[in-house]
């Protein structure tokens, strides 16, 4: 469960950073 959650977070964070900072 934790590895999957960590993988999901790792894939989601860059997307949020990209959207928020507008730096892709």
Swiss-Prot record:
Function: Antibacterial activity against Gram-positive bacterium S.aureus and Gram-negative bacterium E.coli.
Biological source species: Rana luteiventris (Columbia spotted frog)
Location of this chain's protein in the cell: Secreted
Lineage start: Eukaryota, Metazoa, Chordata, Craniata, Vertebrata
Protein name according to UniProt: Brevinin-1Lb
Tissue specificity comment: Expressed by the skin glands.
Sorted UniProt keywords: Amphibian defense peptide, Antibiotic, Antimicrobial, Disulfide bond, Secreted
Major site of localization recorded for this protein: secreted
Pfam families in the record: Antimicrobial_1
GO biological process: defense response to bacterium
Disulfide cross-links: 18-24
């Amino acid at each position: 469960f934790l590895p999957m959650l960590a993988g999901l977070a790792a894939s989601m964070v860059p997307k949020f950073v990209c959207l928020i900072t507008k730096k892709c």
